[in-house]
Amino acid sequence: MTDDVYALDSTKGNYAYLIFGEEIILVDTGRPGQGKGILNDLKSMDMEPQDVKHILITHHDVDHIGSLAFLQQATGAKIWASKEDIPYIYGEKNRPGIKKLISYIMRVKKPENINSYPEDGKIGNIEAISTPGHTPGHVCFIYNGVLFAGDLLRTSNGKIAPMKSFMNWNDSVLNESLVKIDNYDFEWICPAHGEPLKRNGQLKELY
């Protein structure tokens, strides 16, 4: 990948990423209890928690917002999520299906003062792109030729793979989002689940 993007080792399996752009940005926060590991990752890079200025959330699933409240308090960073998913993060709406059970088992402390993404989708030099389907307000990000895919897709054995249907809010809407994102210019795909890999024209195999 590029020298200014890092997959955080402590979140392997459901990756959070650091972006060294105009400001330092964290994409997603992992499961409950992974926040301390993320702080240790920062320390290993000679960084202080307060160096992180923004936390961008791809979607409301517990394995992506589980350490959000902890890291908000530790870093003082500004929190961003989609207006569609913010009510789920605050607990004002229940997650559907199996996700409701998961959120009941994995109790998550609620963050405060979440900002919805700007209409133009710009956070500094990062572009937020609406890609609903996995959740109603799922968002991907593009920075410097890298797509931060969240759970729009996953990777497995060096290939792009679809998300499991039973985990998606709406499969047909997700398919539309795959078509949409394939029209954007990027070289690398950084998923939450699976390892980063080069695009190499594989997206069309998913829709």
Protein language model features and the residues they cover:
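Residue-level marker for buried hydrophobic side chains located in beta-strands
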Residues: 25-27, 56, 79, 146-148, ...
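Short hydrophobic/aromatic-enriched beta-strand-loop microsegments
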Residues: 76-83, 150-151, 167
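Active-site metal-binding motif and surrounding structural segment of the metallo-beta-lactamase
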Residues: 35-81, 118, 188
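Metallo-beta-lactamase
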Residues: 32-33, 85-130, 136-201, 206
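Conserved beta-strand hairpin/beta-sheet module of binuclear metal-dependent hydrolase folds
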Residues: 1-45, 140-152
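Short alpha-helical
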Residues: 14, 33, 62-63, 87, ...
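Pre-active-site segment of Zn-dependent metallo-hydrolases
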Residues: 25-54, 99-113
